[in-house]
Design a protein with these regions (language model features):
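Short secondary-structure junctions
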Residues: 15, 590-593, 748-757, 801-806
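Accessory, non-ATPase domains that flank or precede helicase/AAA+ motor cores in DNA-metabolism machines
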Residues: 1-442, 454-470, 780, 788-792, ...
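Surface-exposed amphipathic alpha-helical segments in non-transmembrane regions
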Residues: 702-704, 710, 745-750, 784, ...
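A short, contiguous, amphipathic alpha-helix enriched in charged residues
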Residues: 35-36, 736-749
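Inter-lobe coupling/hinge segments of SF2-like helicase ATPases
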Residues: 275-284, 288-295, 301-738, 754, ...
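C-terminal structured "cap/appendage" subdomains that terminate the fold
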Residues: 747-784, 790-794
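Short beta-strand elements
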Residues: 182, 596, 752-764, 805-813
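Short beta-strand micro-motifs in enzyme catalytic cores
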Residues: 5-7, 197, 723-725, 773-775
Length: 817
């Protein structure tokens, strides 16, 4: 049989149940240019609708009339390296997503096309005969008439509008099969490449000077020629700006072939470092010892993984800088991940000071154009150091030598939307591909990571002391039950009040932490007990004092707060303090004292995290009040007091990680204190002062916490002694959701019951969100291909089975909630 060239293509329109590499013929004109990593337009499904695809591999196959040909090539060069193609396929298998879901995570939004489907009248179509052929079918006639009414070329969106609530797909499919219509695809890039135009003389210097003498009546043209005679080549816009000449004068000179215009790529960038890179500060003896061990791993010919435990303020970042310097010297690239966008400006400023323009930044807060151009700089090898949040793990770095995850225990490294990946898992895969060093750093490592270090899966390094022998903050535990007995029902304990007063007297700054924005979590009637709840979600509305609004932080629903209870007219009471209420309490306790609030609402008004942080440092605002975004990575030398206002908030929830999250949160926020020359203090407010986790966090004793927590997890069989796999079902009808969940539970018990503990159906903590009920089946199991295969099979079955058409089903590794 005749062998022909074919391409294995991942198709955008393929759902998870039907996702696989599809085989397409490669037309003769594309055989020399098409390569893996290029996007193409292909006909897909019964209607041969034009659809975007990604070429995963090239092959030879027997000629088959059923094979469809590729319509056209979209990228002249591959936009994906072979390593990133392998990563996308691995993510498809690992995270229960389509290959294109993985590609959308790997590539920046600016690289994608907006593809529209256009239906065209067949060449030399006899309209009357075609309408007769449609017979009595109103839908076929409507589709054909709509295309003809638009000049024989009509976008699918226009046809859908003409059909109203009806679907035109069946009618269009019939018209295409009868060869009355053809289908085309039109694509438009989301972000275009930016080019700068440069002007230079297109003639000799002598000829240009002769033209200057001839053109005394065209002063703008003369000015342009004189400037180019002097400087040779410059930006066309700058030449016009400097000379005051209009662009028409430049165009005239170009048309007369006196001036030549050429273009160069221009990178839109979030930051530009203009100074000379400075030397990296020397390491202390303790840091040098850690660096020496990590440097040996960096130079290893095999992939390596290490955990660096360092108390807050121990100088982990300085170790990172020296390791990156070594990687660059060896011709390798480095990626540093940080958990919050708010930390990125500080890291960029610090790293750019040492590595200059070799640093690129990637995070979701950048404009599409800047993120796309930073991606291009990395891909072109112009940036060899990448700093960013979770998505920066996909940076197209060639010859990756070092990948660092700072504060590796943070939940923000886990994606909660498809694909539901953890950056740490992706980092492990990429480091294995590049034979690179994966370095996890934290003052409160993930319990699983610490266990892996203890059992030899990771190398383990420690920095147990603060930089320059600075002391850890002294911590006081404030018993809020005793405060109530003493008549203090406010949010600020007497102990914290005294410490704040002392800090104000000294002219030092303080940070107050509460992980709840808004003014009050619950608004209820003192007479009848009625509460304000979200009509779309099973949660109460949070009161925001600034605009007198009640807001749902899940779906965004909002309404005005009433003066009195809308049910009985009784007095409204406000419970569950948020950052806005704390700010009001501080102003009442310390009249005239300036405060700065750092939460999502304040940032929305200020514009950026960076603006608020710079203002806090520059103006030395006495008190900052903030949510979780202030707990890590921030370094203000004048902050000597931290107050944790509700240490119990994350402790008593139904999650095996509650102790770990509470310990980490308290330890991290307490670590913001005393990072300068003055000693730091911290006050932890709690209703359970005897709780062991809170006491361990107050002592900053991670080892003691780890020992007690790992013993508890071994007893309960939770990670690292098992893997957690969850299958979640959501839908508008609760009965349908529970029925599907029960079916999934029974399926797992029959297929993998011996390998896994199967629990559920159980509602999620917020059971109804955006008018969709959410239930889950959870498996505690050893990591096995059989369990994962069973999960993939049941997800595919439920999403295609007609009896479950009213629900959506997805699987998730180690879910956060």
């Amino acid at each position: 049989m005749l062998q022909i060239p074919v391409a294995k293509v991942a198709v955008l329109a393929a759902t998870f149940a039907f996702d696989r590499p599809y085989t397409y013929k490669i037309p003769q004109p594309l055989t020399d240019t098409l390569r893996p990593g290029c996007r193409v337009m292909v006909p897909f499904s019964r209607g041969n609708r034009p659809c975007e695809g990604m070429v995963l591999a090239l092959d030879q196959a027997q000629d088959d009339p059923k094979l469809k040909p590729i319509m056209r090539q979209l990228d002249p060069e591959p936009i994906l390296s072979p390593e990133l193609i392998r990563l996308a396929i691995w993510m498809h298998d690992r995270f229960f997503c389509t290959i294109y879901d993985a590609l959308h995570a790997i590539l920046p939004a600016g690289v994608w096309y907006r593809v529209s489907t256009v239906y065209c009248a067949a060449p030399e179509l006899d309209a009357d005969a075609a309408l007769t052929l449609c017979g009595r079918s109103k839908q076929r006639r409507l589709a054909l008439e709509t295309v003809l009414a638009h000049g024989g070329r009509c976008p699918l969106e226009t046809l859908q509008t003409a059909f109203g609530d009806n679907d035109p797909a069946s009618a269009l499919h019939w018209l295409v099969e009868q060869k009355l219509l053809t289908v085309e695809g039109a694509e438009k890039r989301v972000v275009r490449d930016k080019q700068l135009e440069y002007a230079s003389l297109a003639v000799s210097l002598e000829e240009a000077q002769e033209e200057i003498r001839r053109r005394r009546r065209a002063p703008h043209q003369v000015a342009i020629l004189e400037l180019l005679c002097t400087i040779g080549r410059a930006s066309a816009d700058e030449v016009c700006q400097f000379t005051g000449a209009p662009k028409t004068s430049m165009k005239t000179l170009v048309r007369q072939k006196l001036v030549h215009i050429d273009t160069e790529p221009y990178f839109r960038r979030p930051t530009h470092y203009t100074g000379q890179p400075k030397p990296i500060p020397a390491l202390t003896a303790a840091q040098a010892e850690v660096f020496s061990g990590l440097q040996a791993l960096l130079r290893s010919p095999d992939a390596q993984a290490a955990l660096l435990f360092g108390v807050t303020g121990s100088g982990k970042t300085l170790v990172y800088l020296h390791l990156i310097e070594q990687a660059l010297a060896a011709g390798q690239g480095a990626i540093l991940l940080v958990p919050e966008i708010s930390l990125t400006p500080q890291m960029i400023e610090a790293f750019s000071a040492y590595f200059g323009d070799a640093v690129a930044v990637l995070h979701s807060g950048l404009p599409l154009s800047e993120r796309y151009d930073e991606w291009k700089r990395i891909r072109a090898g112009l940036a060899r150091v990448v700093v960013g949040t979770r998505s920066a793990v996909f940076a197209p770095m060639e010859n990756l030598g070092l990948l660092i995850i700072d504060e590796e225990q943070e939940d923000t490294y886990k994606s909660e939307s498809t694909p539901r990946y953890h950056a740490r898992d992706v980092a492990k895969f990429r480091c294995a591909q590049h034979r690179a060093l994966l370095l996890l750093g934290s003052a409160t490592p993930d319990v699983v990571s610490r266990y892996y270090a203890e059992t030899g899966r990771y190398h383990y390094f420690t920095l147990p002391d603060r930089f320059n022998a600075r002391k850890l903050p002294g911590v006081i535990i404030a018993d809020m039950k005793q405060e109530l007995r003493n008549g203090n029902s406010g949010s600020i304990s007497s102990v914290l009040y005294a410490e704040l007063e002392e800090n104000l007297r000294r002219g030092e700054q303080s940070i107050l932490f509460l992980n709840r924005r808004g003014a009050s979590k619950l608004v209820t009637c003192a007479e009848c007990g009625a509460t304000y709840s979200c009509p779309n979600c099973s949660v109460s509305l949070t009161y925001h004092q600034g605009n007198q609004m009640l807001v749902c932080h899940h779906c965004g629903y909002r309404q005005r707060v009433d003066d009195r209870c809308p049910v009985c007219g009784g007095e409204l009471r406000f419970f569950g303090d948020g950052t806005e209420r704390i700010e009001a309490d501080v102003h009442a306790l310390f009249p005239g004292v300036e405060t700065l609030r750092m939460d999502a609402d304040a940032i929305a008004m200020a514009g950026t995290h960076e603006a608020l942080l710079q203002r806090f440092a520059r103006e030395r605002i006495p008190i900052m009040i903030g949510t979780q975004m202030i707990t890590k990575g921030l370094n203000f030398e004048n902050v000597t007091l931290v107050g944790v206002l509700n240490a119990d908030q994350s402790l008593y929830v139904g999650d095996y990680r509650a102790n770990e999250r509470t310990f980490s949160l308290i330890t991290q926020v307490v670590g913001r204190s005393g990072r300068g020359d003055a000693p730091g203090r911290a006050v932890i407010q709690t209703f359970t002062p005897a709780n062991e986790t809170i006491r361990q966090a107050a002592r900053q004793d991670y080892d003691a916490f780890y020992r007690s927590e790992i013993a508890l997890r071994q007893l309960n069989g939770t990670p690292p002694f098992s893997e957690v796999l969850a299958v979640t079902v959501s839908g508008a009808q609760e009965n349908a959701v529970v029925r599907c969940c029960a079916y999934i539970r029974d399926y797992f018990r029959q297929t993998v019951g011996e390998r896994a503990e199967v629990l559920g159906p159980a509602p999620l903590p917020v059971v109804r969100m955006n008018n969709r009920y959410r239930y889950r089946v959870t498996l505690y199991c050893s990591q096995s291909k059989a369990v994962r295969r069973a999960a993939a099979n049941i997800v595919m079955y439920c999403n295609t089975e007609k009896s479950f058409r009213d629900v959506t089903v997805f699987a998730d590794d180690n879910p956060l909630d």
